[in-house]
Amino acid sequence: MYHSILEAFRVENNKDVKWYVMADDDTLIFVDNLVELRGTYDHTKYYYIGTNSESIHSNAYISFDMGYGGAGYALSYALVEALASEIDGCIQRYKHLFFSDYISQSCSADLGVDLKIEKGIHQFDISGLLSSHPSSPLISLHHFDAIDPIFPSKNRSESINHLMKPAKFDQSRLFTYLSKHFPSKLSEETPPTFRPWQKSRPPFFMFNTRWLSNNPCEAPHVFFLESVIESNNIGRYHVVVTNYTRSSPGNLPICLSNGNPSANPIHKIQVFSPSTGRKEAGRIECCDVKYVAGEDTVDVKLSACMKGEMLA
């Protein structure tokens, strides 16, 4: 499989080609975000871009320095050009390595090129509700033929089709909504609402987690995508309206210790985002939250953060 990079280079050997991207056939690629990401790198320099596994066990078994082919990785034109004359010898040198993506990492390392990790690329060696997606554009999701459907009322193919509905409007904000009423540092430690790909001893994951709690002030309320529309009836602006509904009844005990009212009455969340501009990669957006006590709907309006606004 790694040799196919050389074949592609020979067929398309011209300066109009900037990147060579490898991924598995069970990987979902968000092309708009991928193109924007590649535009932040100089393809005339040596770049090897990808991610490792979310699972410590997988990385320890294979490599912590490898861009996993399932998640997808990209090689700049300059790097492939440098590899082209050496690729046959490199494959022979590393023929004992079982995985083609491991060979790719090894050959790149022989040129002194290390993996540049991008957090929006997902190997998905976990299964469950990924509430730890970073504030980076969503580039890829792997293992869609094996992981649990991301929408509990749908099968895998239905889940993919449902996810692509908001992707048609705006990929830059996809998978970026997560509301937590905790101190900002604690909110970076997601509760493990997912499980590792394979059974192993902890620690399991390559990111910060905290134990699930029965405390009603800490238990998550989960809402799933229901619909998305573009509307020009909201004032003078065109907006994308994304609706989320509660996945199960809010039957948790009322949380009173932190002085906040219970979220149990809320059954729907409407998110209003600009339809004319993509979210800037690597930047957070701020929001205004409108909720009337006793109602079952919360309105969230996204906008660029004003000077001085920050997570607190």
Question: For the regions a protein language model found, what residue spans apply to each?
Answer:
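Secretory-pathway lumenal glyco-enzymes, predominantly type II signal-anchor Golgi glycosyltransferases
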Residues: 1-312
